[in-house]
Every structure is written in structure tokens, then in C-alpha cells.
Amino acid sequence: MARVKRGVTTHARHKKVLEQSKGFRGRSSTNYRIALERLEKALRYAYRDRRNKKRDFRALWIQRINAAVREHGLTYSKFIFGLDKAGIEIDRKVLAAIAFDDAATFAEIVKKAQAALAA
């Protein structure tokens, strides 16, 4: 059986890691051992933050809706409860966009929520 030397696969693996770590600072982009550690850490951060991004955006939408609703004399909690009672099913992302871009339309939505709360 022929002897297998693994230089080709090692070189390919090193090249792959160094290409992925391109742009890292210092020896993190040129030294394989350091680059591998930094790349693994970067991938862990990326995985974690893809999940955190969803939480962060939801919190941002809620803050924007709350700020817009308080101008109309309601709290966020009561507004969402009013929307539910009124049967209006608009998600927070769209509500935040409407509040941010189109104040008149948002005011109408708030009026409907207030009417449902009063009833």
C-alpha cells in the first residue's frame, strides 16, 4: 500500500482557515494557530448574535411604539391590549414602521385601540 503524506490536506485546511480569518488584526490573520482560535471565537459570536439580533429589534420596535403611543396619552401595554380587543392584528415591526413614518395613520390606529378600551 502506498504511503500517504498529508501535506496537501493540511495546506488546504490551513488555507481555508486563513482565508476566513482575512481582515482580523495582527497575527490573527496570518498565523494558523492564532487564526483558528480567533475564527472559532468569531463564529461563536456570530451564532450568538444572530439570535440576539431578533431580541434587540423587538425591543427597539417596542420602544418606538411606546414613545409614539405616549404622545396620544396611552401606555404601550394598554395600547397592545386595546389592539387585541379591537381585533387589529398588526405586528410590532409594522406598527413601529407606521409610527416612525406615518403619524396620521398611527393616530387612527391609536383611536381605534382607545375606542376598544372604552367599550
From Swiss-Prot:
Ribonucleoprotein recorded as keyword: yes
GO terms for cellular component: ribonucleoprotein complex; ribosome
Biological processes per GO annotation: ribosomal large subunit assembly; translation
GO MF, one annotated term: structural constituent of ribosome
CDD domains: Ribosomal_L20
Keyword annotations from UniProtKB, A to Z: Ribonucleoprotein, Ribosomal protein, RNA-binding, rRNA-binding
Function, in words: Binds directly to 23S ribosomal RNA and is necessary for the in vitro assembly process of the 50S ribosomal subunit. It is not involved in the protein synthesizing functions of that subunit.
NCBIfam families xref list: rplT_bact
Family: Belongs to the bacterial ribosomal protein bL20 family.
Name assigned to this protein: Large ribosomal subunit protein bL20
Organism placement in taxonomy: Bacteria, Pseudomonadati, Pseudomonadota, Alphaproteobacteria, Acetobacterales
